[in-house]
Amino acid sequence: MRAFVLRARSAPTNSQLLLESVGQEAHTEILAHTLMNAIFVAQSHRDDVIVHLVLESTQDFSRTISFTSSEITNVGGFHEQALLTKIARALDLSQGMTKEQERKVEPGITVRTVSFEKLVQELAEDYQLFMMDKKGTNIREQEFEGNPCFLLTDHIPMPKKSFNSLKRLGATKISLGPKMLFASQCVVLIHNELDINM
């Protein structure tokens, strides 16, 4: 199983604000684009992917919305608005949740009040962790074994203190090339490399 974690530091956990933030400073469209490229292929979808979207602009707790591709039955269309609607619905269902609770939104989609750090600690038990870094090992030279998990961010870079805690969890820095790419572009390149070599 391949996993992708998108840490959306500026994405609001209020559904209305989320939908209003498309194309604005928070760039919530990044969530939909990354989800689209992680799960879908031409005329189908991948059945071996889980995507965790961690929304951190909140009054209480971060929200982690997880999409398990093999369990999703209907996303309502292959377009930005349909995917953002699914995310907004998960946020609406998460209202009133206390720390580290989980709710099922619909088949293949869950929402949890869990932080990025806590999520990654859990994932480190079953996945090989990778974080994007221009100075990391070129992805074409990296060995992948078992279940790889790729840690991405929105337009706000990962804080330095997060890099240190990720290193302690065994995360490896990998590079997709000399340019800084959007998370959704990283997903496409990662999938392509794994499709060829795994």
Curated annotation (Swiss-Prot):
The keyword Flavoprotein does not apply. Keywords: Cytoplasm, Methyltransferase, S-adenosyl-L-methionine, Transferase. It comes from the Bacteria. GO terms for molecular function: S-adenosylmethionine-dependent methyltransferase activity; tRNA methyltransferase activity. The keyword tRNA-binding does not apply. S-adenosyl-L-methionine binds at residues 132, 186. Its EC number is 2.1.1.-. It is found in: Cytoplasm. One of its GO terms (cellular component) is cytoplasm. GO terms for biological process: tRNA methylation. HAMAP family: tRNA_methyltr_TrmY. Belongs to the methyltransferase superfamily. TrmY family. PANTHER family: TRNA (PSEUDOURIDINE(54)-N(1))-METHYLTRANSFERASE. This is Putative pseudouridine methyltransferase. It comes from Photobacterium profundum (strain SS9).
